[in-house]
Amino acid sequence: MGLDPPYLGGREAQLERFQDLLRNPHAARNLLVTGLRGVGKTVLLNRYSNAAEAAGWLVAEREFSEPDAEPANFAQTVLADLVRLTRKVSGGARVRSAAVRAAQAVLEHLGTLSVSHSGIEVGVRFQGASHTLRRLDDDLRDALEDVAGLCRHGRHPGIVLRYDEFQVVHERRGASTLSALLTAVGGAQQRSVPVILVLCGLPNLLENVAKAKSYSERMFIVERLGNLTAPEDRLALTEPAEKAARTFDEAVVAAVLRDTAGYPFFIQMYGDALWKGAAASVIGVEDLRRLRPRILHALDRGFFEARYARGSARERELLRLIARHGESATLRQLSADSGLMNNQLQPVISNMLRKGLIYRPSRATLAFTAPMFGAHIRRRGK
C-alpha cells in the first residue's frame, strides 16, 4: 500500500488546497485526510511531502503504530521528529550552530536522548524533577517555536508534520496525547509560527480528533477520500496502458470498473495483472476471464487475509455476521443474528474499532475499513 500509481486521478483539488496552505504559511489551517483502505491516502501524503519539500518547507514524516500512540511514547515520538528536523536546515556554519542550539532546546523537553547533528553529538539527561510539572502541550509548543526559529535562519517557509495511520492515537483517561498535539499546534499558530499539521488515517480518526478537542473542526480542512468516479476511474485504468500503446476492450473496462467499484488500489491491481498477463496489444474479454481468478486470489492473500487474521475468534464471527449484510450492518441486525445484547457485543466491537477492522459510519452502524472486505469474507465461506 502507498506505492505511487502511474495515474493519480481525482485528487487534483486536494493537492491544490495543500498548495494554498504552503503559499500562506500563517493561514493557521491544517489537513485531516481520511478514507478506507486502498483509496490512495498514503499516495496523496507522498505528493504533499514532495510539494512541501520542493517549496523549501521542513517536513517530518511518520507512520504511527500502536506503540507510538502509547502515552509513555507519544511525547518522545513527536519531539524526536522535531529534533530530526533541525538536521535538515540548510545554510552555513552560523545556521548549523543555531540548529545545534535548537536541537539542544528541544532535547531538554525529552529528558534523555542523543542524536548526531552535523557531526556533533547532541544529548541531554534528565536534570531535576521540576520538568515533570510541565504539560506536554507546553513542551510541544515550545519545541515547535524553537524549530520554527531555525526556519528563518535557513530560509525555510515553515514546518510540516505529516502523520499517517494516525487513527491509532486517541485520548486515554488520565493521559494527554492527541489533545496535547492539537493544543500545541493551535497555540503555535496563534503566535504566527508557520506550522502545518497533516493527520491521515481511517474514518474513525475524525471521531478521535473531535473527542480530543471541541474546537478541532476549526483547525482542519477535512479531505474525505473515496472511490474514483467517472471519468477518473476509467482513466486510472486506461491512461497508463495507452502511454505504452496498450488498450483495453470496452467490455473489459466496464467489467473491471464494476469489479473494483472505482477503488484506486483495486484498479491498480487489475490493471497490473491484465497488463502482465495479456500478450496482445489489445487486452480482451478472454484475458480478463482467464486472469480474474488469479487477481481475486492475489487480493485475498495480499490485501484482505492479513486484516482478517488480526481478528480473534469472536471478532471474526462478528466480521462474518457483518458480511452477511454486505459491507456494513446495523447493531440491531448484529444483535438479532448473534443472539447477543448490545452490551454483550460492545467489548468485541471496541476491540475491532481499535484494531482498525471496522468503523462507525453512523451511531448504530458498523462498516468494514477495507472496501469489498465483505465480498472477501463471503468468498472464504464458499
Regions found by a protein language model. Name each.
Residues 152-155, 159-162, 167-213:
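Sensor-1/coupling segment of RecA-like P-loop NTPase cores
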Residues 262, 266-342:
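Winged-helix-like regulatory helical subdomains adjacent to P-loop NTPase cores
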Residues 225-252:
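Conserved small helical "lid"/interfacial subdomain of P-loop NTPases
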Residues 338-355, 363:
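Short amphipathic alpha-helical interaction segments
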Residues 247-259, 330-333:
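Short conserved motifs of the RecA-like P-loop NTPase core
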Residues 371-382:
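Short, amphipathic alpha-helical interaction segments positioned at domain boundaries
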